């Protein structure tokens, strides 16, 4: 089967969050038995240099604000084809210092127009799998009435809060037909279109990244026209739980760890916890923390409203009052949050038990996973979440809000701790206190939580099998 994965992120090349990880992991799992090609836009200032074999390179035309030229360069990478599309005559759109900017609907619609032109020139494509609203226009462009044939289109919602509202005139720049454009337009305001809305109507099947989040989406009334769109397609909509790549996230082989360990040590809990402790010592030395403070809780997250930054701040107070260590590693995406957390970071530089790191440093993050006893994920909503899956893989017990994919993967008393209420901090503090108390006073119970998490299948094989089932059902 020829499968194309279209996205604006793919680890390890271009990544801002979990989207890039999922696109890479799913593609790699599918490529074992199928011909998988990943389409990415070229970001001149961001794309890393790499020496993979070039399979093909050619120039082609696409329509967006007139006739434009693009170059498709295809590489062989880990059994897959990675095709990077450079918008030669509109290169300034992607010459940015960050993946996402204020002009994303324009930039990514131009990429979608180029991707559609590229796909239409290929000999045979069975499935085009589009990831999130960024490539929503691609669904409509691949369903144009004048096309002699078109592949089956799968669209995955990674975060329903981001939808791609834009001007209808902007989408018209792709020369999409009036019929196609109508799928994107809002009835209440035809001058406004929504990339997500059009993708819902123009795709053969729609998925999201966990079963619980699928229900959250069906119960979301924040925009009644988007709600009508998803309800009209609910018979071809489901949640498929994300997974992680066990080869990438593996404490037995991770070079960033001071000491490696794995599930084979579950037969010798004392040895396992000694190795976790050695990683903790290495991290404490690196960050200047005092070894007197234990357990170690971490937060590894984008610091945005969705992720519960107010709970992250509350955790700092709880750690101070209860004498355990806390490391927060994350990136802020707005100036006010950046200001607040920078002030906190500066005020805690001499703290013996708390550190805030406002940067994503992959080796450091991996060491944190290996050193931490617990990982806190206080999200207001969470489509799936990958950090809890990685944490469990590294023997780090998840403390989560029971929502979306977190509810699907973390069960209180089985492999972690949960809280529900977000109107105050009482439920959250109760969860933290329960986790710290269990660690300190009930080592046998704590080991059972760690064991359950480390033995949990990553879900990557299952995820790929579910998607293959969807693909096959459409062919």
From Swiss-Prot:
Name of this protein: Glycogen synthase
Catalytic activity: [(1->4)-alpha-D-glucosyl](n) + ADP-alpha-D-glucose = [(1->4)-alpha-D-glucosyl](n+1) + ADP + H(+)
Keyword Hydrolase: no
BP GO annotations: glycogen biosynthetic process
GO molecular function: alpha-1,4-glucan glucosyltransferase (ADP-glucose donor) activity; alpha-1,4-glucan glucosyltransferase (UDP-glucose donor) activity
Key words, A-Z: Glycogen biosynthesis, Glycosyltransferase, Transferase
Source organism (scientific name): Chlamydia abortus (strain DSM 27085 / S26/3) (Chlamydophila abortus)
Family statement drawn from the similarity comment of this UniProt entry: Belongs to the glycosyltransferase 1 family. Bacterial/plant glycogen synthase subfamily.
Gene: glgA
Its EC number(s): 2.4.1.21
Recorded coiled-coil stretches: none
Gene3D superfamilies for this protein: Glycogen Phosphorylase B
Domain of life: Bacteria
Pathways per UniProt: Glycan biosynthesis; glycogen biosynthesis
InterPro entries, per the entry: Glyco_trans_1, GS/SS, Starch_synth_cat_dom
Residues annotated for ADP-alpha-D-glucose binding in this entry: 15
Role description: Synthesizes alpha-1,4-glucan chains using ADP-glucose.
Keyword DNA damage assigned: no
């Amino acid at each position: 089967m020829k499968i194309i994965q279209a996205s604006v992120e793919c680890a390890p090349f271009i990544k801002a969050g979990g989207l890039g990880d999922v696109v890479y992991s799913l593609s790699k799992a599918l490529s074992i038995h199928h011909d998988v090609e990943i389409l990415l836009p070229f970001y001149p200032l961001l794309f890393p240099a790499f020496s993979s074999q070039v399979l093909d390179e050619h120039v082609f035309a696409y329509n967006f604000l007139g006739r434009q030229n693009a170059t498709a360069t295809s590489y062989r990478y880990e059994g897959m084809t990675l095709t990077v599309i450079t918008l030669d005559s509109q290169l300034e759109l992607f010459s940015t210092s960050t993946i996402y900017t204020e002009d994303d609907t324009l930039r990514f619609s131009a990429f979608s127009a180029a991707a559609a032109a590229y796909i239409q020139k290929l000999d045979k494509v069975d499935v085009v799998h589009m990831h999130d609203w960024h490539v929503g226009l691609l669904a409509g462009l691949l369903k144009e009435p004048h096309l002699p044939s078109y592949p089956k289109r799968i669209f995955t919602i990674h975060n329903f809060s981001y939808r791609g509202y834009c001007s209808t005139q902007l989408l018209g720049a792709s020369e999409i037909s009036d019929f196609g454009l109508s799928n994107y337009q809002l009835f209440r305001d035809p001058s406004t279109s929504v990339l997500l809305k059009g993708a819902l109507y123009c795709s053969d099947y729609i998925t999201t990244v966990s079963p619980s989040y699928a229900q959250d989406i069906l119960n979301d009334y924040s925009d009644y026209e988007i709600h009508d769109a998803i309800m009209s397609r609910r018979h071809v909509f489901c949640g498929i739980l994300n997974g992680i790549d066990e080869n990438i996230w593996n404490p037995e082989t991770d070079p960033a760890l001071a000491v490696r360990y794995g599930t084979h040590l579950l037969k010798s809990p004392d040895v396992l916890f000694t190795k976790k402790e050695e990683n903790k010592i290495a991290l404490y030395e690196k960050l200047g923390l005092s070894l007197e403070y234990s357990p170690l809780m971490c937060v590894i997250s984008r610091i945005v409203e969705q992720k519960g930054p107010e709970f992250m701040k509350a955790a700092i107070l709880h750690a101070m009052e209860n004498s355990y260590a806390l490391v927060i590693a994350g990136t802020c995406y707005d100036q006010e949050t950046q200001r607040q957390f920078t002030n906190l970071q500066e005020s805690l530089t001499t703290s013996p038990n708390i550190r805030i790191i406002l940067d994503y440093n992959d080796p450091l993050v991996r060491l944190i996973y290996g050193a931490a006893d617990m990982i806190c994920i206080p999200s207001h909503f969470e489509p799936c979440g990958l950090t809890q899956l990685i944490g469990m893989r590294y023997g780090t017990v998840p403390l989560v809000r029971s929502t979306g994919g977190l509810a699907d993967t973390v069960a209180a008393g089985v492999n972690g701790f949960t809280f529900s209420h977000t109107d105050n901090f009482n439920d959250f503090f109760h969860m933290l206190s329960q986790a710290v108390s269990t660690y300190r006073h009930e080592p046998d119970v704590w080991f059972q939580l760690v064991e359950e998490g480390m033995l949990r299948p990553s879900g990557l094989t299952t995820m790929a099998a579910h998607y293959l089932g969807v693909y096959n059902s459409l062919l």
